[in-house]
Amino acid sequence: MLTTTILILLIVILMVSLHLYYRWYLLRSSPFNRTTAASTFFTDPSSTPGGLNPSIIKSLPIFTFSAVTALFAMECSVCLSEFKDNESGRVMPNCKHTFHVHCIDMWFHSHSSCPLCRSQIEPFAGGVKSSMDEVAISISDPVYGDTNHHEGTETTGDSVPEDSQRKPAAIEISQRNLGEIENDLSRSHSFRSPTDEPDDIFHSEFESRSGEVLLLLLLLSEFLIFCFRRSVACK
């Protein structure tokens, strides 16, 4: 009788302990506490990065929005308002996100990343750089033949008249047209928040851990019931 009572007390204590542990695990793994714990931190104000250099801000490409030629409505993520006709905006070189010029310039006074996806705005190499790649083609006049006669004087191929020594002309050809820029803007419009995917991973991991804890509880309860029946049968 004493052995049975002790086994029952042990079973009750173990079940209560497992129940308390399971509740603690659920509270610890909840998204609310996870967000609160992740957002509670302290930073040194002296180590906080400053804004972008004004020369880098001016080098970012600018476009003029047109409601007639635009394929879709564009929205500035800083002021949360849509672009209107003939409004100027800036395109981020890495992520291709678009913002109002005055909104993003004010943002870059104290930040150095995109306000939407947090990608760093890297300075252009070699100073200010155009948003479109350009190809320079040099065209020069052909050199005259081996011998030339000018006013009755014979000249060899080494001496070339001054009129023929002209500077080469450079023609700049843009490699990107307006259609490619609109395609880049359309891809940036379908931007997905980077916090969506980690949430899905967290929920799947949480469900798998919950299943493991429940399975452990069932196995322990079956084992304790087996021990209890064994002790009763021995009597």
UniProtKB/Swiss-Prot annotation:
Membrane topology of the entry: Single-pass membrane protein
Pathway this chain belongs to: Protein modification; protein ubiquitination
Enzyme Commission code: 2.3.2.27
GO annotation, cellular component aspect: membrane
Homology family: Belongs to the RING-type zinc finger family. ATL subfamily.
General function of this protein: May be involved in the early steps of the plant defense signaling pathway.
Name of this protein: RING-H2 finger protein ATL17
Species of provenance: Arabidopsis thaliana (Mouse-ear cress)
Gene it is expressed from: ATL17
